[in-house]
C-alpha cells in the first residue's frame, strides 16, 4: 500500500494486486483533435478529452490562435491570430503549434520550459522553411512570421520524432500539400494522426509515408478513446502481481502503445483482449529482447517488467534519450538504486532480473519514470519513496488515485 498523495508518496510491498481500472482518455488523440478543431470550417466537439498539463497546453494554444472554447465545443476563428504560444513541456503542442503558426498572419513565438527547450525542432523548421516560411531559431523559443506557406510538396525528416510528420500533416490539411516523411520513428503515431484526420473529413492518398493531403477540414464530433500508454502501468501490475482488468481500450487501435499487449505475452503473462477491455494475469516472467523505437513511451514500464524476469532482457529504442528525460539514464539510475543489475547501452539497457528493494525514486521530472517506479515499488522489499508524485499530472493526473482504488479492491 502507500501513504497519502501529497509532497511525498510512500509505496510498500503488496502480496497481490487484483482489481479493475478505466483507462484515461488518450493524450495523443486529444492533442490532434484540438488542433484540427482549430483549423476546421465549422464548430467541433471533442468528447471525453484528456485533461492533463500537456493537453491543457494545447487547449491554451488553440485559444491563443483564436479558437473559442466552451466546454467540449470548439469554434474556429475566421482567421488565425498570431501570438505567444507557451507549450510548457509538451512536445506535441510545440511542434504542431509551430506548423500552425505558419498560417497566422504576423509573428508568433513558440516557447516552452524544462527539457522541451533542449529537444530537437530543426527538421520541422527546415520543412517549413522549404515552404518559404520565415523562422528565427531552431530550438525554443522560435519566432514564426506566418501567413502564406508556399508549395505543393514537402519532405520532413522524422528520424528524431514522428511529431514533425504529424505537424506537417495537420498543416497540409488546411492548405493542401504532399508530405513525405523520411525515416519515421514511432510510426504508429503517424497512423493515429491519419485516423483523426479521417474523422474530420480530410481526404488524402498515401503511398507508405508519402501522403497527398487535400485541403478541407470539416467540424467533427470526435470521441477520444482510452490511452494504452497510461493503461500499460496497470496492465504491467497485473502481469507482475495478480490480475488487473483495464476497460476503455479499443481493440485494434493504431496507438503505438497498444503493443504492450503482445509484449506482455512475450514476457509470459496471460492476456485476454476483449472488444473494449484487456485483462492481464500473472504468470512466470521470462526475459525478452525488444526494440521500442516505435513505442518509446513504453520503455520505462518494460524495464520494470524486465527487473522481475529471471535472466537478461535487452530493451532498446532510437530516441529514448530525447524524451522528457534521458530515459535510458533515468531508468538505469533508478533500477540500480533498487538493486537491479543494469548495463547502459547507447540506445537502451541490458537488465538482469532480480529482487528489487525499496528506494527513493529520482523522477528526472518525467511522468512516465514516476509511474513506472511506483509499479516497481509494489513488489520491492521495503519502502519506495516518491518525493514528487505531482509530475504524473503531465499525462495522467489521477494515476495515484486509480492505483489506490485498484489496491483497495484486492
Curated annotation (Swiss-Prot):
GO terms for molecular function: 3-phosphoshikimate 1-carboxyvinyltransferase activity. GO terms for cellular component: cytoplasm. SUPFAM superfamilies: EPT/RTPC-like (SSF55205). Keywords: Amino-acid biosynthesis, Aromatic amino acid biosynthesis, Cytoplasm, Transferase. It holds the Pfam family EPSP_synthase. It comes from the Archaea. InterPro entries: Enolpyruvate_Tfrase_dom, Enolpyruvate_Tfrase_sf, EPSP_synthase, EPSP_synthase_CS, RNA3'P_cycl/enolpyr_Trfase_a/b. Pathway: Metabolic intermediate biosynthesis; chorismate biosynthesis. One of its GO terms (biological process) is chorismate biosynthetic process. Belongs to the EPSP synthase family. Monomer. This is 3-phosphoshikimate 1-carboxyvinyltransferase. It comes from Pyrococcus abyssi (strain GE5 / Orsay). The gene is aroA.
Amino acid at each position: 500500500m502507500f501513504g497519502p498523495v501529497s509532497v511525498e508518496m510512500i509505496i510498500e510491498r503488496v502480496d497481490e494486486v487484483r482489481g479493475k481500472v478505466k483507462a484515461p482518455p488518450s493524450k495523443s488523440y486529444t492533442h490532434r483533435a484540438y488542433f484540427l478543431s482549430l483549423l476546421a470550417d465549422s464548430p467541433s466537439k471533442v468528447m471525453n478529452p484528456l485533461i492533463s498539463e500537456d493537453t491543457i497546453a494545447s487547449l491554451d494554444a488553440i485559444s491563443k490562435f483564436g479558437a473559442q472554447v466552451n466546454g467540449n465545443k470548439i469554434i474556429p476563428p475566421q482567421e488565425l491570430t498570431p501570438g505567444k504560444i507557451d507549450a510548457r513541456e509538451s512536445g506535441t503542442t510545440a511542434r504542431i503549434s509551430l506548423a500552425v503558426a505558419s498560417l497566422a498572419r504576423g509573428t508568433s513565438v513558440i516557447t516552452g520550459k524544462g527539457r522541451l527547450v533542449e529537444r530537437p525542432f530543426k527538421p520541422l523548421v527546415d520543412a517549413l522553411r522549404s515552404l518559404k516560411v520565415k523562422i528565427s531559431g531552431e530550438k525554443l523559443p522560435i519566432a514564426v512570421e506566418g501567413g502564406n506557406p508556399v508549395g505543393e510538396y514537402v519532405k520532413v525528416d522524422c528520424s528524431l520524432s514522428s511529431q514533425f510528420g504529424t505537424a506537417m500533416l495537420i498543416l497540409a490539411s488546411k492548405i493542401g500539400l504532399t508530405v513525405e516523411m523520411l525515416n519515421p520513428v514511432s510510426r504508429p503515431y503517424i497512423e493515429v494522426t491519419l485516423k483523426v484526420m479521417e474523422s474530420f473529413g480530410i481526404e488524402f492518398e498515401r503511398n507508405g509515408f508519402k501522403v497527398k493531403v487535400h485541403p478541407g477540414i470539416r467540424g467533427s464530433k470526435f470521441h477520444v478513446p482510452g490511452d494504452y500508454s497510461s493503461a500499460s502501468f496497470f496492465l504491467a501490475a497485473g502481469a507482475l502481481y495478480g490480475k488487473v482488468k483495464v476497460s476503455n481500450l479499443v481493440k485494434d487501435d493504431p496507438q503505438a502503445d497498444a503493443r504492450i499487449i503482445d509484449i506482455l505475452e512475450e514476457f509470459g503473462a496471460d492476456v485476454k483482449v476483449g472488444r473494449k477491455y484487456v485483462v492481464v494475469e500473472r504468470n512466470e516472467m521470462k526475459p525478452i529482447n525488444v526494440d521500442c523505437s516505435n513505442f518509446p513511451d513504453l520503455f520505462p514500464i518494460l524495464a520494470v517488467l524486465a527487473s522481475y524476469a529471471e535472466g537478461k532482457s535487452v530493451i532498446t529504442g532510437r530516441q529514448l534519450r530525447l524524451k522528457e528525460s534521458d530515459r535510458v539514464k533515468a531508468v538505469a539510475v533508478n533500477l540500480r538504486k533498487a538493486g537491479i543489475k543494469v548495463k547502459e547501452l547507447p540506445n537502451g539497457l541490458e537488465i538482469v532480473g532480480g529482487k528489487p528493494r525499496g528506494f527513493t525514486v529520482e523522477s528526472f521530472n518525467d511522468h512516465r519514470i514516476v509511474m513506472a517506479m511506483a509499479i516497481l515499488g509494489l513488489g520491492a522489499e521495503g519502502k519506495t519513496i516518491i518525493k514528487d508524485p505531482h509530475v504524473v499530472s503531465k499525462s495522467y493526473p489521477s494515476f495515484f488515485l486509480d492505483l489506490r482504488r485498484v489496491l483497495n479492491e484486492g
